[in-house]
Amino acid sequence: MYADVIIDISIEQLDKTFQYAVPQELQDVIELGMTVDIPFGTGNRQITGYVVGLGEKAAYPVEKIKFITGITEGKVTAVSRMIRLAAWLKHNYGCTMNQAIKTVVPVKDKVKQKEKRSVNLIIDKAQAQDYLDTFAKKNAKARYRLLEALINEPVIEENIIKSKLNITAQIIKTFEDMGIVEVRSEDMYRNPVRNVSGERKHIELNEQQKNAVDKIISDYDNGDYKTYLLHGVTGSGKTEVYLEAIEHVLSQGRQAIVLIPEIALTFQTVQRFYHRFGDKVSIMNSRMSKGERYDQFLRAQRGDISVMIGPRSALFTPFSNIGLIVIDEEHEGAYKSETVPRYHAREVACHIAEEAGASVILGSATPSMESYYAAMNGYIELIKLDSRAGSGELPSVDIVDLREELRLGNRTIFRNRLRELMSDRLAKHEQIMLFLNKRGVAGFISCRSCGKVMKCPHCDVSLTEHADGRLMCHYCGYTAPKITVCPSCGSRYVSGFRAGTEGVEAQVKKTFPQARVLRMDMDTTRGKDGHEKILSEFANGNADILIGTQMIVKGHDFPNVTLMGVLAADMSLYASDYRAAERTFQLLTQAAGRAGRAEKSGNVVIQTYTPEHFSIVSAANQDYNAFYEQEIAYRKLCGYPPVDNLMKIMLSSPDEILLTKSAAWVKAFVDNNCMVEGLMCIGPADAPIYKIKDVYSKIIYVKHKDREVLTDIYEKLDVNIVGSQAFRDVFVQYVING
């Protein structure tokens, strides 16, 4: 038996594994993730490594392969647990071991650790005075200045000595050589939690919140670690339930991870958690520097922090004794990784909790179909919060039929009802949020004469017009100058559907010139603290209206917001995705939940071309059960998740002919070698966007009730495809229930 071993956790070594022979006496006990002692290098010095692979085949001549010395006793480290998790990811999500390890293990990369260096006087005052007299006689002004300062203050930071006293590094080195001082270094861990102030507020839980907390804590204390679906209407106080459960877990000496769906939620969430748990809280997000991210992993390993808040990557924080994982807004699509391995944070969290003996809380006002289906079938436990916390009431909702408005001659983006309510709220000095699921000024540019749509020459998508007139492809970044004449027929009737966030901002300023307006989308939030700055401005009352895309409707709590306008509710209904109705319902329900969250009553206006659609009606009524019953019937009829499991096999290649042949081979392989009762293989078909950056893509779908059947198919395909010359220029990815 042979073991693949990595010797260090950094990017450089993750690409390099070393093969060792496993002694006979260890073959029955060695496992993935174990820490082992190995001879390394020409001198065979003994070091430790991590087992990342086991097999019977030697990759090198047998006589050159060294033997593992032994298994390191008592070394079930956080890293070794992460490696076992990587092996689980590899099996469940179709990736290589190295891809899985790079996902879960806290990698160092080439981050230079920040240090605080201090200069310490190590001689007594009498000796120091003798040296001082000598320096005065020799007119050694710099040395005199440094020693005089150290006599008054025996420990001074090196950077202060250099900047304030104007002392060079050479003089400090001379003092070290003379035995006068000692320079000491201390690692400085960057703390990404900034600008958090205020005191902890005591919030009295209502009866439903108390019951939820009591249930979770009681089960936990009895060693009954469960997964809970906390289904609470918007504003029902789910976060307070999280905080109480976390406080209990921390009191037992364990740690907690809180996942948020995207960086836009961090600002307010961190404030609430930091006020409760202080410096034991840290955050992780994609906009932090590599150094900041690495520091948080080190702080977690050292036990300096107990609560990590962040998006799905925070799930891999190397805590030694994890007791609770919270996934807020668990329905969010951001919890599904778009890169290999294409894991879902919810599934991984449940696996981590099962291994660690921990609880999981999935919180949402609009649970994913997967989670609610699991609760309805007894796989997880459902806890409901039916009413808003405090005195908040659910808002009044108006559905506006855009077709009728158009017949009445209203072609503006603000229909009559919305315009009336906006005027009313501005007069009352209350705040307004306007939600649009778009980016840019225009969705697409087309010729009104011949119908030609301006498309990217490299991708099968339309170009988007921005405020400066440029046309841009948001897939590959291609840009083109403003078009005034149709390149196909020469007509000058070329324009776009002006309903992007920038266009809405312009219309608001034109219609309500006195209003103070903020826009929050991908373009205005670039940079490290872009989200925080805009949210702080709005929270502090420095703007009357906040316009934005999806990021403004998710999880924010602004007490003075009493009107939410949804400008184009049904745009997401037309996506080529079986989850389109679910995502539309979730977005609209979340948007409606932003209004009237405190003492003031709220209004929501939903503008739509399909007011009768069940997802829109259910969202307006905040009726999750009505939506679920209709949607699950559709999923059962079509055999879609969560009823059945669905694997998407995506093949991509710059060679269109090769891609067609490869996709046909995969389809035939599944049909001829993997068929079991109830299996369905569909395709191949062109991907929704067939060409991106001159690379073509096709998709094959495989359905079955048993997920393991799909995993077996992936593994069989992988064995035949990896290393095959026929697939050398074809990239194959597998996504299960994506």
Task: Give, region by region, the residue ranges found by the protein language model.
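Accessory, non-ATPase domains that flank or precede helicase/AAA+ motor cores in DNA-metabolism machines
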Residues: 1-364, 376-392, 673-676, 701, ...
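A general secondary-structure signal for short beta-strands and their flanking turns/coil
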Residues: 2, 15, 44, 429, ...
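A general secondary-structure junction signal
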Residues: 53-55, 105, 185-187, 436-438, ...
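Short, amphipathic alpha-helical segments that act as regulatory/interfacial helices
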Residues: 87-90, 147, 151, 176, ...
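Generic solvent-exposed, charged/amphipathic alpha-helical segments
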Residues: 87-90, 419, 423, 505, ...
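Short amphipathic alpha-helix segments
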Residues: 624, 660-682
